[in-house]
Amino acid sequence: PDGTTVLKEIDFSLDKGQTLGIIGATGSGKSTIVRLLLRLYDPTNGQIRINGRDIRSLDPAELHQYFGIVLQKDVLFADTIEKNIDFGRRFSKEQIEEAAARAQAKEFIQQLPQQLAYELHARGSNLSGGQKQRVLLSRALAGEPQILVLDDSASALDYQTDAKLRQVLKQQFADTTTILIAQRIGSIQHADKILVLENGRMSGFGDHATLLATNTIYQEIYHGQTGGRINA
């Protein structure tokens, strides 16, 4: 936005239904990719295509219909859980409940007084971090998006819940292309493809095993987070 080039020489493609993990140090350009996808700003060079179409040729409303997104700074507003998930889209209660179940939010919602009618405080301050993330995930999944973008949005989930969520995405959203932006390799190592960013450039692109064997940046992140342990 200020004239500084944030990303350079980024070139990759994804097939429908594939999962892409994006990892890199803070400031490497991970979240900029999301902003470009949503056309919060456009690339100065090159193109971004969805189904073969340059996204600059799409009406903004049409473009946004492709996506279900959970960003780091997404907020919950002071209203019921149901309305926070619905987000003005007029889904049926059954659709809301299904989205909550898929996002692993059903169990904790059922334990709340009034359940889906439970009133949240501003920013969801009366929920835990993991609960807030699951409500936001419910919002994203409710629209059954063609492209799901999760920007470090499962960081507060425990391992078991994260694993269940991955299984749901694999089984029930098999045709949805998923982009996972994460700080932890454990959150993306199961992705079909992983994009490694360093200072706005593509340092590596491949699956976990390939990058672990060939990419120095990925190896450094991995060993720094695991102490060198090999986690399948």
Over which residues does each language-model region extend?
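ABC-type nucleotide-binding domain
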Residues: P1-A232
